[in-house]
Swiss-Prot record:
Name of protein: 3-dehydroquinate synthase
Chain sites annotated for binding Zn(2+): 178, 242, 256
Family: Belongs to the sugar phosphate cyclases superfamily. Dehydroquinate synthase family.
The record's free-text note on cofactor binding: Binds 1 divalent metal cation per subunit. Can use either Co(2+) or Zn(2+).
Catalysed reaction equations from the record: 7-phospho-2-dehydro-3-deoxy-D-arabino-heptonate = 3-dehydroquinate + phosphate
PANTHER family: 3-DEHYDROQUINATE SYNTHASE (PTHR43622), 3-DEHYDROQUINATE SYNTHASE, CHLOROPLASTIC (PTHR43622:SF7)
One Gene Ontology term of the molecular function aspect: nucleotide binding
Coiled coil: none
GO biological process: amino acid biosynthetic process; aromatic amino acid family biosynthetic process; chorismate biosynthetic process
Principal subcellular localisation of the protein: cytoplasm
Keywords: Amino-acid biosynthesis, Aromatic amino acid biosynthesis, Cobalt, Cytoplasm, Lyase, Metal-binding, NAD, Nucleotide-binding, Zinc
Annotated organism of origin: Staphylococcus epidermidis (strain ATCC 35984 / DSM 28319 / BCRC 17069 / CCUG 31568 / BM 3577 / RP62A)
């Protein structure tokens, strides 16, 4: 499966299939220098394959720590100085091979190196089906997640489904949260469809029909970001579950998608408090439990600590915290939420887990 973005210019292909890595050559063969920035776990799992690929294209491998730990200013500084020591020209290509954090980090390197060099995304996780598309790149600050960054489009996104076959279940759960989020944004039909396909942890672990839902998720995201690349309006809808999710992810260092799924649950409760919605919260809790999401951390949360990190969210303005909420499935809105409502919803969330 393949599709292409539809911006006014500078469009790029998104290739989703098994053995997609074979398409890499056409996007990097004309560059003078090539660097593969690779997630450590991915490198260890596919070392022979990746070293052979690097040798084929005369590329240097830079292996970085797995996950969010790589997205520090210190690691950025060390990596960019290493790259600059190679007397680079702008005919340099950075290839990100890893999950969402690797793509964020390598993309920010590419965006800032010599004011911008070529960049190819090779996502290796389910989670990265979301982050690799749309052009957001960046690193973290001590004040919060993704607060230092840029909008920078890749030359191509090459999504080789072969990489997904080695994912541990925790990573599958993390990625599925974003796939599920896209279904919620699409509406009731898409939500019922995905829930009826992934009915248990065993079905999800088998990745049944996953390629279809990944492709649908990518299309959903593209339909939004092509209209609003710089997140001035409707692109904010893609942050469904992320205001609360990012806060607990950053505070408790849990996997991104695990936190987002809890954030999705929380926004349903907030929506019930603010709007005339009547979401069946227990239904969503039961569904998450069927898939074996680790929800016990909800009991450990403290409102004031979580609220502090919610205040750092990039969607906020001088009027306070803004959240993406679903007025109905498929009908997202961005709205301010006062502290009292947030606290009341927080207390209700915890009440389900006593």
């Amino acid at each position: 499966m393949e599709l292409k973005t539809s911006y006014a210019s500078d469009n790029y292909p998104i290739i989703v299939k098994h053995h997609a890595i074979n398409s890499l050559e056409r996007y990097i063969k004309n560059e003078e220098q090539r660097f593969f920035i690779i997630d450590k776990q991915v490198y260890n799992l596919f070392v022979d394959k990746l070293e052979a690929l690097a040798q084929k294209f005369d590329a240097k491998c830079i292996v970085i720590p797995s996950g969010e730990t790589s997205k520090s200013f210190e690691h950025y500084h060390r990596t960019i100085e290493y790259l600059l020591s190679h007397q680079l020209t702008r005919q340099t290509c950075i290839v990100a091979i890893g999950g969402g954090a690797t793509g964020d980090f390598a993309g920010f390197i590419a965006a800032t190196l010599l004011r911008g060099v070529s960049f190819v995304q090779v996502p290796t996780t389910i989670l990265a089906h979301d982050s690799s598309v749309g052009g957001k790149v960046g690193i973290n600050s001590e004040h919060g997640k993704n607060l230092i960054g840029a909008f920078y489009r890749p030359k191509a996104v090459i999504y080789d489904l072969d990489f997904l076959e080695t994912l541990p279940y925790s990573e599958i759960l993390s990625g599925y949260a974003e796939v599920y989020k896209h279904a919620l944004l699409n509406g009731e039909k898409s939500t019922k469809n995905i829930e009826s396909n992934f009915t248990s942890n065993k079905v999800l672990q088998a990745l049944k029909n996953l390629d279809y839902y990944l492709f649908e998720g990518i299309k959903t995201k593209l339909n939004i970001v092509v209209e609003d690349e710089k997140e001035k309006g409707k692109r904010k809808f893609l942050n469904l579950g992320h205001t609360f999710g990012h806060a607990i992810e950053y505070e408790h260092k849990i996997p991104h998608g695990h936190a987002v799924m809890i954030g999705i649950l929380y926004q349903f409760i907030v929506a019930n408090h603010l709007f005339e919605t009547n979401y069946n919260i227990q239904h969503y809790i039961n569904y998450m439990k069927k898939l074996k999401y680790p929800l016990s951390i909800i009991k450990q949360l403290h409102f004031e600590d979580t609220y502090h990190f919610m205040l750092l969210d990039k969607k906020n303005d001088y009027n306070g915290i803004q959240m993406v909420l679903l007025k109905n499935l498929g009908k997202p809105v961005v709205t301010h939420v006062d502290k009292d409502t947030l606290l009341s919803a927080f207390e209700e969330l915890q009440s389900y887990f006593k």
